[in-house]
Amino acid sequence: MNILLAWELGGNWGHVSRDLPVLCRLQSGGHNVLYAVRDVTISSPLSASVGIQCIASPMGAAISRMPRNLAGYAEILFADGLGDVAILRERITGWQHLFTEHQIDVVVSDYAPSALLAALVAKIPSVAFGSGFEIPPDVALLPSFCVGGAQDESARRFSEGLIVYNVNRVMKQLGGAPLQQMAQIYQGTHCVLATFAELDHITDRPSGALYAGPVQELPGSMAASWRTTNKPRVLVYLRGMGLLIDEVLRVLGGIGAEVIAVLPDAGSIRYVHADVRMFRQQVCFDGLLDSADLVIASGAGSITLSLLAGVPVLLCSACSEHEMMASRVEEMGAGIAVRAEMVVADAMHHVLHDDSFRDAAVNFAAKYAGFSQKTAIATVIDVINKASSGHS
């Protein structure tokens, strides 16, 4: 079977660390796999290291960096160019050319709506594997990313209507069936959520969703270990938050913590002390989480792995996606989100010294004690096999 895994939206290591384990398992099972990615710079060397063929996804015209704090799914698609019919058509036909060239039997989407539209036109079975944020629910109006989302309902209806209008213009040109609503981009797609229900970004997803759990394993991750036993052990993984990173490290220095900080794109760091080790590349969390006292992070993958190890989280949000995840963790009682009006030192002290946060994380870990990433990967592969055979 020829399988294309398409990554179109989002960035950084989280997508690659979720995609490559699935691709490797498929390839070892005798399938031909192709990885079409948004970011070749990150993905190509990592894919090559495990023998996976990697190419650039069809991006159409040049797209600027995704704005932060968008209000809804339609705004994401507009920002990525789907508000322009020419770009959308170029994107979809680009995917179709790949399908034909490589005789693709199944398309697997990692946050790749244009690839799913192309699969609809080509009548190729499709599977979506991703976080709750990346796989929207099948509802008439997709959820708002904002607190009090009812206030922007009319604007979201208008934006989604424009996206559907543009999509349908292209679908008509290419011989595809029209959409009635934006969620139908996923119509006929077998969806597998790389999370748990408690950590789904969507709080009111319709029943029947398939939760496989997280997959996060990056080849070439550096090994690290704790050096002390008499200090708080804190694991930090943050991107693009220069001022906040400085403040976090300053506070950690003040409490005498041992810190392993993964800061891939941080610039010059002002507050560094002897017990801080900084890494620009990914670090293997195995062996660190078991004896960590706190994790400071923003991404869904790192947060979920921390909670599976029973470690509470200080949540630092840089976008709506992070905010939605932070709210779920706070509802669970396993962490605190640092917001503009908060003092980092107070929030950190609260999580470290109030046992209720660790208790909530430990309870979550106990509930999913039987979980393994191998099982999650097996679930995805089972769905891919069923999709290819035409089963529901």
Q: How does the language model describe each region?
A:
Residues 183-185, 345-392:
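C-terminal amphipathic helix plus adjacent low-complexity
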Residues 7-20, 241-242:
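A short, glycine/small-residue-rich beta-strand->loop->alpha-helix junction that serves as a flexible
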Residues 23, 200-293:
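Donor-nucleotide binding loops and adjacent catalytic segments primarily
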Residues 125-208:
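Active-site-proximal region of nucleotide-activated glycan assembly enzymes
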Residues 69-108, 112-114, 155-181:
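Conserved nucleotide-sugar donor-binding subdomain of glycosyltransferases
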